[in-house]
Amino acid sequence: MSALLVEIDKDQFQAEVLEAEGYVLVDYFSDGCVPCKALMPDVEELAAKYEGKVAFRKFNTSSARRLAISQKILGLPTITLYKGGQKVEEVTKDDATRENIDAMIAKHVG
């Protein structure tokens, strides 16, 4: 299932997220973030649910702090939905639940 939630690095971010057509959801996490790891299976399930409608990517901020700051990622986990390279909505920290992520996607994608 995790093949739908693809990990990208800072060198791929521009092409995979900022230059992508359509919707891209990015799961920002770090090596030491326990809530991030707990949330990952839920994000993988949502990737399957929205397959073909939203591209799901995960991004480890541990090795790319500058990029995380440039995207205004101030707390983890942060789940951000982009459309055509523009940030449209995000949920972060305690609000980053499966239900809230699903509702955010459904609101924009349908």
Swiss-Prot record:
Keyword terms of this UniProt record: Disulfide bond, Electron transport, Redox-active center, Transport
UniProt cross-references to PROSITE patterns, sorted A to Z: THIOREDOXIN_1, THIOREDOXIN_2
Gene Ontology MF terms in the entry: protein-disulfide reductase activity
Gene name linked to the record: trxA
Protein name: Thioredoxin
GO terms for cellular component: cytoplasm
NCBIfam families in alphabetical order: ThioredTrxAClost (NF047697)
Annotated ranges, domain Thioredoxin: 2-110
Functional summary from the UniProt entry: Participates in various redox reactions through the reversible oxidation of its active center dithiol to a disulfide and catalyzes dithiol-disulfide exchange reactions.
Annotated S-S bridges: 33-36
Source organism of the structure: Peptoclostridium acidaminophilum
Protein family (similarity comment): Belongs to the thioredoxin family.
Signal peptide positions on this chain: none
